[in-house]
């Protein structure tokens, strides 16, 4: 089989240099290589904005590592960009001359506006969302704020504050105190003050974070047993934990990786300032940002499709699933959801989309074998890259697939963080019934049905005489009723 070409994006950031190498497979991107090295370029800027020789050497050493990977990739498939620190450096030409020689490739220093726009493109390709979306990316020397809808950025700014510069300015001696955090937050608010009104007037429906700070926050919250959604109270709690440590060299937070320790307090202070200034309710982690935006720019793909739809379509293609049958199960499950939504108060925003994808991907485990297909399906979802899905959404999807037939495994449904455990169980009950109704795998064979619920009691009503004419499905439905009743959920099967 002929392999599709490789594409590479390199981001010369103010804190770290990143390289992403991908291949396009079945309409989706497959990561081949990811390399990150902490260079702390911004820490090498003096008061006259000259990069120190040591900082430049750190950058060149990193690019020597990257250069080997680029040798077999066509030049037209590579994009290398520099961001905030290289925009500021007065001796940037000295750095670029050697950097381009090492890489054997040109380097673009992109404007703050272009950086913000490219970040938004990466987010729109890799993160799902409807309506206006606020994107926050806290870099080493700049912070990008973008509001957009679908693939269009409507309002964007690149602000002169970042986790490395705020580290130097406010936590340079390593002290972690209430006063230092207050100082750092106030300074960030002063920067935000100039643009805040524009963002509040335009408004947004969802907020996503695309930086290492937000990645670190999510890792901490999951390690500490919290949901993945970032809120101001959670940020303030983490600030309290950091202050309790007293000093940067004593900072220890459960879930915080050692490589993120140094710039975490400064990034946290900036994020608290953003939350308080813009009155943000909650935020989740974006699936991608600048590097992904650069890659999709090289590919020139259109943005008309939801990120999760692209991922599902790619998996259906890669695993050779029966798409016609999958869509039939999807339509049946969504009809069942819509009937039960008022009584069960099911989440249209968080529950319905994941039920939809569970229906579309329910046969993915068959690529391994039939008997344990639900477990195999859950394993695949747990361990595959799924652009557009947050970690909690992946866990819910995995739990639904794990519970699509046979005995219920409640712990998987209760441990995911996308919806409540009770809602997850109800979604699983809907999926299981929908799969049985679609067993014939033929268009026009799904019966008309009515689902009614009162608390956990569930009644499925089918056309009169249907069960006598469809013995196998009737038998499977009776077995399913027994399973659900065994769990303590009153379930009835009627004809009318």
Swiss-Prot record:
Pathway assignment: Purine metabolism; ppGpp biosynthesis; ppGpp from GTP: step 2/2
An annotated Gene Ontology molecular function: guanosine-5'-triphosphate,3'-diphosphate diphosphatase activity
Record keywords, A-Z: Hydrolase
Catalytic activity: guanosine 3'-diphosphate 5'-triphosphate + H2O = guanosine 3',5'-bis(diphosphate) + phosphate + H(+)
GO biological process assignments: guanosine pentaphosphate catabolic process; guanosine tetraphosphate biosynthetic process; nucleobase-containing small molecule interconversion
Residues forming coiled coils: none
E.C. designation(s): 3.6.1.40
Key word Coiled coil present: no
Function: Catalyzes the conversion of pppGpp to ppGpp. Guanosine pentaphosphate (pppGpp) is a cytoplasmic signaling molecule which together with ppGpp controls the 'stringent response', an adaptive process that allows bacteria to respond to amino acid starvation, resulting in the coordinated regulation of numerous cellular activities.
Assigned protein family: Belongs to the GppA/Ppx family. GppA subfamily.
Name used for this protein in its record: Guanosine-5'-triphosphate,3'-diphosphate pyrophosphatase
Native source species: Aeromonas salmonicida (strain A449)
Lineage, uppermost ranks: Bacteria, Pseudomonadati, Pseudomonadota, Gammaproteobacteria, Aeromonadales
Gene name linked to the record: gppA
